[in-house]
Structure formats: structure tokens, C-alpha cells
Amino acid sequence: PPASPPVISMSRLFLSQVAACLAVFGLCCSDAAVLAYQETADPSRFELTELVRGLVQPMELAVGPDGTVWLIEISGKLRRLSPGSSVPELAGELKVTTEQENGLIGMALDPQFAKNGWIYLQYSPPDYPGQHISRFTIVDGQLDLSSEKLLLKFEEQRKECCHHAGSLHFGPRGELFIATGDNTHPHGDSQGYAPIDERPEKAPWDAQKSAANTSSYSGKILRIRPTPEGGYEIPEGNLFPADGSAGRPEIYAMGCRNPWRMTVDQKT
């Protein structure tokens, strides 16, 4: 039988919220339980190393096989930090809109990056009302803009803010996971609670149109398998059939608010 799809976990922010809840719970329990929690959260177990300063809204980073750190800024800049250096070099820049939390918001290196130089970027073009997920090639340490292969694009509303999420990660079998936000205003009449507003003029405040919609790419974790030609396949294990008869076949998980960051368990 085919292998089960990997288990995906939410961002560090989510994990920190869980840890905070456990801490509060520990206050209501025995002293031993509190001490046990304190031991598992001992910050002295971690070593902090400062790599660089002066970045403007860095979004994601990835470490290449040779130790080079690749990172993106929301303004559209891709930077490269060589091993032993504290000065990141500009490796390329995409034209993006940065309104309403848009911009260059996701990045992942291809599992065979050392051989093919492929890098995947999730960004918000200024001339398209939505998001692009594209593959580019790094040539001599620089982003070759002419090498772009557009894998996936989807429209969003830009009348109101917010929630575009944006995070890319590869799984152990070459699957690319893509985090997308619900593209819904979190405030206003909903007062920070789940935005469900079916009044026609309140569409930007209604997440039913996105996170709960099987025909929308927004408010989801998508899962595809990129092909060398620049397209992608649908791996087994997604929510809906590959023929699109019941929903977008790229959807792996739905009902997400704003999955800002994620990790993929490479063992499972």
C-alpha cells in the first residue's frame, strides 16, 4: 500500500501558545508538575547565535547544503548569507505589493538544491490580485528572474485586510506544502472572533468564502509534488480526489485562519 502522507504541524507561534496553556494549567497542579514544566522549558538548553542585523521584515530562511543561509524580506528581496559572514548579500528582488500583509512571504529550497539550484517563492505580484507560487533557478548565487516557472496562482480580495499566511516546506517524499491564509478581515463586527458574516456587503469579513470553501485555495494547507518540467502532480492522501470532482485536489487541510508558519515532520 502507498505510504501515508506526512503529519504536518503548525507554527512555532502555535506551539508557544500550547506551552503557555500548559504553564497556566501547571499552576493549578502540584509543585512537582510545575517543576517538571520548568525543567522542560529551561532556556539554558538553547544557545543563541546572532547571524545578522539590519534586516527589514525577514519572513523565512533556509540553510543550503553548503551552509549558505537564504532568506527573504517581505519587500521582495532575496538575500544570501555565506558561511562565516555577517553581511547578507542581495541575491535578487521580485516586484511585489506589500499592502495588507502581502509581499514575498514564503520560500523553500528544492530537496536537490545542490544539483539543480531551484528555489520556490510565494509572493504577491502588484499586477495580479492574489498569490503566485513559482520556481526559480539560482545561477552563480543570484536569482535568475527569467527562469520563473509558475506552479500555482490564486486570486484573493484586496478590498480589505488581511491574512495571506505564506510558508513553504518540503516533505520527505518531494511534496511541497503551501500555507495560505483565509484572506478575511479579523476585526470589525466580528470583534476578533471567527469572522462569519453572510451579508453581501461584508464578504471580506466572511471566512466561509475561503477557509470553509472547498473551491478556494485560501485558508488551507496545500500539498503538491513539483515536476522537473515546472508543473506539479497531486500526491495521494490529500482531502479530495485528484480529478477535482469534490474540491480542489491540492487541499491537504482546510479551515485554517492564518497559518503563518509551519513545519513538516520528516519522519512521519
Residue ranges and their predicted role:
Residues 1-9:
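Short, Lys/Arg-enriched N-terminal segments with co-localized hydrophobic residues
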Residues 37-55, 148:
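A short helix->beta-strand "capping" segment at the edge of beta-propeller domains
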